[in-house]
């Protein structure tokens, strides 16, 4: 469905970032990364109080491929 898009400004895009404006049928990644982080790892703010006394992150992942990118060129 067509849309009218007003003015916009892009300050920064990462190396694997995607910016799409308008109609699109598929957006396919060109790279993949697997990130493991425990409780409170990605908190942001001015004054945080994180109370995670005993924490364990389960990193067991039994599948071989999470996001296939073989044919995404």
Curated annotation (Swiss-Prot):
Induction text: Expression is sigma K-dependent and negatively regulated by GerE.
Keywords for this protein: Germination, Sporulation
InterPro entries xref list: Spore_germination_GerPA (IPR019618)
Keyword Flavoprotein listed: no
Pfam families, sorted: gerPA
Lineage: superkingdom: Bacteria
GO biological process terms, semicolon-separated: sporulation resulting in formation of a cellular spore
Keyword Transcription regulation: no
Family from the record: Belongs to the GerPA/GerPF family.
Function of the protein: Required for the formation of functionally normal spores. Could be involved in the establishment of normal spore coat structure and/or permeability, which allows the access of germinants to their receptor.
Protein name, entry field: Probable spore germination protein GerPA
Organism from which the protein derives: Bacillus subtilis (strain 168)
The gene coding this protein: gerPA
């Amino acid at each position: 469905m067509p849309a009218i898009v007003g003015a916009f400004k892009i300050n920064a895009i990462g190396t694997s970032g995607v910016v799409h404006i308008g109609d699109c049928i598929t957006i396919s990644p060109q790279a993949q990364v697997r990130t493991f982080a425990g409780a409170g790892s990605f908190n942001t703010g001015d004054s945080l109080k994180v109370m995670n006394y005993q924490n364990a992150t389960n990193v067991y992942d039994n599948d071989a491929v999470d996001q296939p990118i073989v044919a995404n060129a």
